C-alpha cells in the first residue's frame, strides 16, 4: 500500500470518530427537564398576567361604580333643583295673579255699587241705560275671569260668623237671627283656593 493511500485511510478514520449522531444531545442537558422548566415558567408568567388583569378589572369596576354613584347623586340633585324651580315659578305666578285680583277688587266693588244704587229713573232713561248695561257686563266678565283663576266669593249672609272668612264691622239687634249670624254683607270677600284674598266685611246679629 502506498503512503498516500495510508494517509487517506487514517483521515477517514479520524473523521468517523468525531462525527456525532443526529439524535445525540449535548452532554449535561436533559430534554425532559428543560421542557418542564420552560412550561412551568410560561404558566407562572400566564398566572401573573391573569392576576394583573383581574386586579385591573376590579379597579375599573370600582371606578365605574364610583362614577355611577356620582351620576345618580347628580341626577337626584338636578331633579330636586328642577322641581324646586317649578314650585318657585308656580308660586310666583300665583302671587302675580293674587296681586292682580286684589288690585281689581276695588273696581269690582265700585261697579257693584253703581248697579245697586242707580236711581230707578236713571235705569229707565234711554241715554243712561246702555252705560249701566255696559257696567253690568264688565262686572260679570270680571267675575267669570275670577272663577277661571279659581277665585270665589265668600258666602256671608245667613252664615255663622267665621273669623277666618268674615270681618264683623258692627253688631245689631235682630229679632229673627241668632247671635253672631251674618245679617248683612257690607263688602264681598274673596278666596283663591284655600287662601283668603279679602275677608268679607259683615254686620252680625247681637
Swiss-Prot record:
One of its GO terms (molecular function) is unfolded protein binding. GO terms for biological process: protein folding. GO terms for cellular component: cytoplasm. Residues 1-64 are annotated as: Disordered. Keywords: Chaperone, Cytoplasm, Stress response. It holds the Pfam family GrpE. Residues 46-58 have a biased composition (Basic and acidic residues). It is found in: Cytoplasm. Belongs to the GrpE family. Participates actively in the response to hyperosmotic and heat shock by preventing the aggregation of stress-denatured proteins, in association with DnaK and GrpE. It is the nucleotide exchange factor for DnaK and may function as a thermosensor. Unfolded proteins bind initially to DnaJ; upon interaction with the DnaJ-bound protein, DnaK hydrolyzes its bound ATP, resulting in the formation of a stable complex. GrpE releases ADP from DnaK; ATP binding to DnaK triggers the release of the substrate protein, thus completing the reaction cycle. Homodimer. This is Protein GrpE. It comes from Prosthecochloris aestuarii (strain DSM 271 / SK 413).
